[in-house]
Amino acid sequence: MEAIKGSDVNVPDAVFAWLLDGRGGVKPLEDNDVIDSQHPCWLHLNYTHPDSARWLASTPLLPNNVRDALAGESSRPRVSRMGEGTLITLRCINGSTDERPDQLVAMRLYMDERFIVSTRQRKVLALDDVVSDLQEGTGPVDCGGWLVDVCDALTDHASEFIEELHDKIIDLEDNLLDQQIPPRGFLALLRKQLIVMRRYMAPQRDVYARLASERLPWMSDDHRRRMQDIADRLGRGLDEIDACIARTGIMADEIAQVMQESLARRTYTMSLMAMVFLPSTFLTGLFGVNLGGIPGGGWRFGFSLFCILLVVLIGGVTLWLHRSKWL
């Protein structure tokens, strides 16, 4: 493949444009640099920036059917070979487990053995690990190593997020054993996050597996082996997600049962109170009719005797309920 001039990929508002030095480090790309397989270029763009959008729409370095995909038209993880290059769409985790499940950020990239063009709108936090390694001189030396390191960083972030969700489920299960109900919406958010993760990480695992099996010229056998390991690791994470989704379903049933039992206890208590006070209510209503005068109204001990009668009646009903094992 022909070499590319640095001026051909000069985008003023690029997030960064670096030239890999072939020894694990990078340097800022300059117009007189020569880009080839020994010194590939990494151009990282925000496709919403005007200069980046114009470059994506006009550069001859990109196939026509790649431009729309890099400009944000593609969202689900996938991989497509485009002649000598490859178009890859990946998803990564941004944010924490307390946020709504919209923290999956899309990253789109087109690459061959000479240069890498990656685009995003929101910042991709997983790339910070790769950027840090390159700045320290311990990063990838070629395009194949770069792709493996990026996929490894994305999977690390996904695995950490899945582990955090798993810990929350364990805490929730422990609380349910103590009859503690989680706040409203907590379990629904947790389940939604798991479902969204499952939706995007399953095709991403397939992307990794395909990259491991494709005979891409810029990926060595070691790169393919590492990529297969990454796919297997993400597959284990998906198995964990499936188990967590099943456990949230069981917890939802358990929460419903706990709430139903609590409501039944309250209803039972109110029914017993009604049974205890029903006879006394009947007597007070009967004596309060006052059609022929209140019985005992002219006797000074009448009210006291009536109160004693009510206490004895309530005690008798309570004793009967206790002997009947209703209390």
From Swiss-Prot:
The keyword Signal does not apply. CDD domains: ZntB-like_1. Zn(2+) 1 binds at residues 92, 157. Pfam families: CorA. Its main location: membrane. It is a multi-pass membrane protein. Zn(2+) 3 binds at residue 307. The keyword Metal-binding applies. Residues 295-300 are periplasmic. It is found in: Cell inner membrane. Zn(2+) 2 binds at residues 166, 244. Disruption phenotype: Disruption of the gene has a marked effect on resistance levels to zinc and cadmium, but does not significantly alter the sensitivities to cobalt, nickel or manganese. The chain crosses the membrane at residues 274-294, 301-321. One of its GO terms (molecular function) is magnesium ion transmembrane transporter activity. Residues 1-273, 322-327 are cytoplasmic. It catalyses: Zn(2+)(out) + H(+)(out) = Zn(2+)(in) + H(+)(in). GO terms for cellular component: plasma membrane. Zinc transporter. Acts as a Zn(2+):proton symporter, which likely mediates zinc ion uptake. A role in zinc efflux has been proposed by Worlock et al, but ZntB was later shown in E.coli to likely mediate zinc uptake, using a transport mechanism that does not resemble the one proposed for homologous CorA channels. Belongs to the CorA metal ion transporter (MIT) (TC 1.A.35) family. This is Zinc transport protein ZntB. It comes from Salmonella typhimurium (strain LT2 / SGSC1412 / ATCC 700720). The gene is zntB.
